Regions:
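Hydrophobic helix-and-loop "lid/oligomerization" segment in the mid-to-C-terminal part
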Residues: 1-96, 100-128
């Protein structure tokens, strides 16, 4: 049925949308707006809420080349998802022990989210 396909692609749970509303205020820009990122802090993190699509939201912003989502899954463990229009984010992910594709990659950084963010942005800053 067409509506089932549409629902599978477009419909989000209420929990996911409520989480997005909490995370969007964290939107931050770096490197003259070429990088935009969202952060899910430890107090917001809920393993039962689907947040994988959140990394796409910063990509919709004019001038943004690299979109990142930092997810603090434990006090000293940060999961990172990256999407890019032209930067090889897989090279950055591999440098942090992760992997992926040229334009979509991720890694886990064993550091608090603030420290992980600083490390990753420094590495990406050399590429944008």
């Amino acid at each position: 049925q067409p509506n089932e396909i549409s629902d599978a692609l477009d419909v989000r749970s209420r929990d996911t949308v409520e989480m997005l509303a909490k995370v969007l205020p964290s939107l931050t820009f770096a490197y003259d707006g070429k990088i935009a990122y969202l952060t899910i802090t430890n107090d917001l993190y809920d393993k039962d809420v689907q947040t994988d699509s959140f990394v796409s939201y910063p990509r919709y912003i004019e001038g943004v080349d690299v979109a990142i989502m930092f997810k603090a899954v434990e006090p000293a463990v940060t999961r990172v998802s990256m999407r890019s229009k032209s930067v090889d984010v897989s090279a950055v992910a591999v440098a942090f022990g992760g992997g992926g594709h040229l334009r979509a990659a991720g890694c886990t950084i064993y550091a608090p989210v603030e420290e992980a963010r600083t490390q990753l942005l420094e590495a990406l800053g050399k590429l944008v």
